[in-house]
């Protein structure tokens, strides 16, 4: 198993697919990382040489990923909540933020139905 940014990558996958298992790296960024590291995107991870893996580590290290990115996102949400702005209030109440209707939908965000006591 190749280990990049603290994540074990599945050896049977192509490099650009395997890199997407790192939080903060999606399709576009994984292709950019492969291009910058001079690694063919359709190479299987098991076929990578040690210098190629090291080049990938260096390129991935240039981005904010994994724990740092999770912390940044959490701090941004906490800042919105502390500001008492509309988005912060919606986060605090666990409701949709972007204008979606909540009268009939939004069950995922609101959680399971709560029985009404008569």
From Swiss-Prot:
UniProt keyword list: Ribonucleoprotein, Ribosomal protein, RNA-binding, rRNA-binding, tRNA-binding
Cellular component GO terms, alphabetical: cytosol; small ribosomal subunit
Swiss-Prot/TrEMBL GO biological process terms: translation
Region called Disordered, residue ranges: 99-118
GO molecular function, one term: rRNA binding
Domain of life per record: Bacteria
NCBIfam families, A to Z: uS13_bact
Subunit note: Part of the 30S ribosomal subunit. Forms a loose heterodimer with protein S19. Forms two bridges to the 50S subunit in the 70S ribosome.
Family: Belongs to the universal ribosomal protein uS13 family.
Protein function: Located at the top of the head of the 30S subunit, it contacts several helices of the 16S rRNA. In the 70S ribosome it contacts the 23S rRNA (bridge B1a) and protein L5 of the 50S subunit (bridge B1b), connecting the 2 subunits; these bridges are implicated in subunit movement. Contacts the tRNAs in the A and P-sites.
Protein name per the record: Small ribosomal subunit protein uS13
Species: Xylella fastidiosa (strain M12)
Designated gene of the protein: rpsM
């Amino acid at each position: 198993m190749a280990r990049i940014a603290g994540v074990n990558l599945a050896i049977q996958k192509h490099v650009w697919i395997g890199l997407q298992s790192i939080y903060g790296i999606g399709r576009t960024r994984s292709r950019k990382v492969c291009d910058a590291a001079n690694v063919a995107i359709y190479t299987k991870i098991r076929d990578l040489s040690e210098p190629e893996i090291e080049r990938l580590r260096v390129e991935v290290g240039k981005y904010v990923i994994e724990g740092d990115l999770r912390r940044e996102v959490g701090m941004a949400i906490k800042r919105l909540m502390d500001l008492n702005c509309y988005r912060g209030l919606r986060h605090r109440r666990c409701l949709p933020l972007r204008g979606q209707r909540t009268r009939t939908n939004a069950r995922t965000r609101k959680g399971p139905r709560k029985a009404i006591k008569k």
